[in-house]
From Swiss-Prot:
Keyword Repeat among UniProt keywords: yes
Further comment found in the protein's record: Human have a similar number of genes as other primates despite the relative hairlessness of humans.
Organism: Homo sapiens
Protein's recorded name: Small cysteine and glycine repeat-containing protein 5
Coiled coil regions, renumbered to chain: none
Keywords, sorted A to Z: Keratin, Repeat
Family recorded in the similarity comment: Belongs to the KRTAP type 28 family.
Amino acid sequence: MGCCGCGGCGGCGGGCGGGCGSCTTCRCYRVGCCSSCCPCCRGCCGGCCSTPVICCCRRTCCSCGCGCGKGCCQQKGCCQKQCCC
């Protein structure tokens, strides 16, 4: 199916899946860009995805020690309100 970008995020590199019919199936996002149709960017912290992860965090939110790295959460339980004070 190839890859698709979401809004202003541009295209995706090779190796990512998902179709382009809906941004809910787009699995590749670029660092530093986000749009209203990037669902994984809608978390307690906001921010943007660099990999197809559950939730994204700003780097300033990632000092809670709950699995955040390189500006993004690596697991579903990472992005909780208490994590992003």
